[in-house]
Amino acid sequence: MRLLGLDVGSKTIGVAVSDPLGITAQSVMTIPIDEDRHNFGMRSLKKLVREYEANGFVLGLPKNMDGTAGRSVSRSKAMGERLEQKFGLPVYYDDERLTTVASERILVEEAGMHDRRQRKEVVDQMAAVLILQNYLDLQRKE
């Protein structure tokens, strides 16, 4: 089962894809979106679904540290509903607490990306990788 992992933000969507066996996640791209103009990146996502023959989506669910729903949960849920309607594929959710923080740390400490502008271009993709990889790991444990 091949899945697309999405880190849905207010201006961009970070995208990752699993390998065909559902073991590892790799970054793919960052899709610009414009909520005010109702541009949710569906055209780009459609191409990716076809290209990777995706069977579903994993979206990050931005919870607060105490486990309650964060402000952006509604954004992720709305995107999940759009994806289900558009593609007819299942949408799964994974707790994304601290994925952006972890992504920033990885990019600075392990990849040596100290330039904030440079990191900004890939941090959403890295967060999508972490969301998807966490989901894949949990599925293998079950």
From Swiss-Prot:
Alphabetically ordered keywords of this record: Cytoplasm, Hydrolase, Nuclease, Ribosome biogenesis
Enzyme Commission identifier(s): 3.1.-.-
Alphabetical list of InterPro entries matching this protein: RNaseH-like_sf (IPR012337), YqgF (IPR005227), YqgF/RNaseH-like_dom (IPR006641), YqgF/RNaseH-like_dom_sf (IPR037027)
First-listed, main subcellular location of the protein, grouped into a coarse class: cytoplasm
Record carries keyword Protein transport: no
Gene Ontology cellular component annotations, sorted alphabetically: cytosol
Subcellular location: Cytoplasm
GO biological process: rRNA 5'-end processing
Example GO molecular function: nuclease activity
Top enzyme class: hydrolase
PANTHER family documented for this protein: POLYNUCLEOTIDYL TRANSFERASE, RIBONUCLEASE H-LIKE SUPERFAMILY PROTEIN
Alphabetized HAMAP family for the sequence: Nuclease_YqgF
Family classification: Belongs to the YqgF nuclease family.
Functional note: Could be a nuclease involved in processing of the 5'-end of pre-16S rRNA.
Protein name (Swiss-Prot/TrEMBL): Putative pre-16S rRNA nuclease
Lineage summary: Bacteria, Bacillati, Bacillota, Bacilli, Lactobacillales
